[in-house]
């Protein structure tokens, strides 16, 4: 049913703001802060995003017209936000999820954004987000927690 399709089964049952999370995600974050951000900004959806930094192991080149060099940057680091798979939704959005079809959270977010609904992004640090769907990260988290 996709990452959001099964939520259509809750249409008449959920009356309050709800957290939704992919099953293989952990974040080290005070969830009450995320909820406070969501409510203060009157968002319909809040996406929890992790900040990521990746060093590029090569020099990069930016060019202009006719292939002219504009800038040469040696081994830059790029920074961006990624979707962690954790969301806060207002209950009326459950009515926007079609029944009995594959439907993803990303599509719901795009639909809300397209109609100018309020979609917020709550950033968390790179280290606070754990994707335990990745075996290396899963093992690292199990090992780390067993030594505490």
PLM segments and residue spans:
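A short, conserved acidic/glycine-rich loop-to-beta-strand motif
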Residues: 41-51
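Residues at alpha-helix caps and immediate loop-helix transition turns in enzyme cores, especially N-
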Residues: 6, 30-31
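Catalytic-core segments of class I nucleotidyltransferases/pyrophosphorylases
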Residues: 18-19, 26, 32-39, 52-55, ...
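Short, surface-exposed amphipathic charged segments that create phosphate/polyanion-binding patches used
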Residues: 8-9, 61-62, 135-140
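Conserved catalytic core of nucleotide-sugar-dependent glycosyltransferases
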Residues: 59-69
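Short phosphate-binding loop-to-helix
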Residues: 1-19
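Conserved hydrophobic/aromatic beta-strand scaffold that supports enzyme active sites
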Residues: 47, 60, 86-88
């Amino acid at each position: 049913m996709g990452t959001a399709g099964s939520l259509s089964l809750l249409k008449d049952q959920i009356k309050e703001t709800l957290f939704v999370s992919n099953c293989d995600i952990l974040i080290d974050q005070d969830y009450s802060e995320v909820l406070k951000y969501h409510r203060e900004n009157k968002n319909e959806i809040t996406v929890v995003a992790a900040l990521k930094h990746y060093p590029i192991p090569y020099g990069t080149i930016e060019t202009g017209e006719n292939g002219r060099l504009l800038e040469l940057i040696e081994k830059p680091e790029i920074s961006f936000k990624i979707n962690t798979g954790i969301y806060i939704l207002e209950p009326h959005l459950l009515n926007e999820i079609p029944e009995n079809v594959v439907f993803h959270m990303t599509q719901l977010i795009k639909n809300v954004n397209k109609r100018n609904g309020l979609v917020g992004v709550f950033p968390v640090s790179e280290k606070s987000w754990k994707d335990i769907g990745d075996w290396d990260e899963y093992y690292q988290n199990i090992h780390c927690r067993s030594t505490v």
